[in-house]
Amino acid sequence: MARLLVAVVNELSYRALVWLTYRLAATVALGLPFVLLIWSAWRREPVVQRLLGLYWKVASLMGISLLLLTDERPLGYVTAVVAPVLMVVSVWFWVDLNEELADQPPWRPLPLTVRLWRWALSGFGVISLVMTATGLRCMQSQSSPDCSAWLEAPQGIHRGVETVFDFVFGGQWTEAVAAFVGYVALVAYLAGLLQWLLVRLPRYGRVAGEF
């Protein structure tokens, strides 16, 4: 009885941590940068717009992970681990953008908020990396309750998208369709990443320029 109780508590605790990771992602990795993007467009801050434009290109891997996990595709667990690492790197990597941000007056609200957000994103990246790494064991077997916790949010989002898709287009947005779109998007993502690694990085290094 005691062992069963401990197992139930551990299961609930792990599920709570998984949902905390998803909520942090929705806040720090999606919500805040979206607000900052609108803010920077309104204030016409080109350096912040360029930084966030690059960030959103990289962060699309998180959306790809959700599409793959919707249909319980094992590859989704791998991309979920890689995504936060690349997202954190994308906001610190560029030398010219770092210098331009450093030159901004520290008392200005938008540059200050961007600086704070970058550190918050870095903290989220560490938490997300640790948590998603524990989900890699689900690549072999997804029948455990711990693995089900990782699927709840993607499948919940899928049900909402499915309802909207059916209402607007009168078609079916199934789990298989979501996974197919995820695979196509992943191929495009990897092609863009490979092109950057082989062509742009050797030529321009850590300078974002007009990229």
What are these regions, as identified by a protein language model?
Residues 4-32, 175-183:
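Hydrophobic transmembrane alpha-helical segments in integral membrane proteins
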Residues 10-19, 38-48:
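Short juxtamembrane and helix-loop transition motifs at transmembrane-helix boundaries
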Residues 28-44, 193-197:
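N-terminal signal-anchor/start-transfer transmembrane helix
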Residues 46, 68-77:
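Membrane-interface helix caps and helix-loop-helix hairpins in membrane proteins
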Residues 47-56, 209:
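Membrane-interfacial loop-to-transmembrane alpha-helix junctions, especially the N-terminal start
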Residues 52-72:
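A generic, lipid-embedded transmembrane alpha helix
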Residues 77-152:
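Membrane-proximal helix-loop-helix units in multi-pass membrane proteins
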Residues 120-211:
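C-terminal membrane-adjacent module
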